[in-house]
């Protein structure tokens, strides 16, 4: 398993000449998409990858919803191009999807099929480690991002916002 110091060094290397541009670097916008659809056939998976202030592939996983619970749940899986780091989280939305917040697995209705372990296994098979949520806010000196005032490990590996 990677340590945050390893990922911080890799981020510093990747950002040494400025923010990496996935389009210019030829990053694959479809990386893992078809394989994820096969790994999680019960869920709808949408590719949200773009390289506007993002340094990862981002996939939204929409499980079958539970009628009558008053919330809509979606998962997000991100695979960094900066290093082999993987992130997974759930968002709970109001039914109109205008308001949402990240929630732990424990707050999911038990009827929702949680693909977390399947995605962790998939990521490990591809050589990726899941980043500990406590590491996402680790500040990195010497990196200037385009949007964020402070460079953090999460912003350098996944999204600069």
For each feature predicted by the language model, list its residue ranges.
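Extended, charge-biased low-complexity segments
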Residues: 2-126
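Acidic, proline/glycine-rich low-complexity IDRs
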Residues: 119-161
């Amino acid at each position: 398993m990677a340590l945050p110091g390893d990922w911080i060094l890799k981020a510093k290397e990747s950002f040494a000449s400025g923010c990496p541009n996935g389009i210019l670097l030829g990053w694959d916008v479809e990386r893992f998409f078809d394989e994820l659809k096969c790994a999680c056939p019960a869920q709808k998976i949408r590719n949200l990858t773009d390289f506007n202030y993002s340094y990862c592939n981002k996939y939204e996983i929409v499980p079958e919803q539970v009628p009558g619970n008053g919330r809509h749940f979606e998962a997000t899986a991100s695979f960094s191009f900066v290093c082999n780091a993987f992130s997974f989280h759930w968002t709970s939305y109001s039914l109109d999807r205008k308001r949402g917040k990240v929630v732990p697995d424990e707050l999911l209705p038990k009827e929702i099929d949680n693909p977390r372990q399947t995605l962790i296994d998939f990521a490990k098979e591809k050589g990726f480690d899941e980043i500990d949520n406590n590491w996402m806010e680790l500040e990195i000196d010497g990196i200037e991002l385009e949007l964020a005032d402070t460079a953090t490990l999460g912003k350098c590996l996944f999204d600069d916002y």
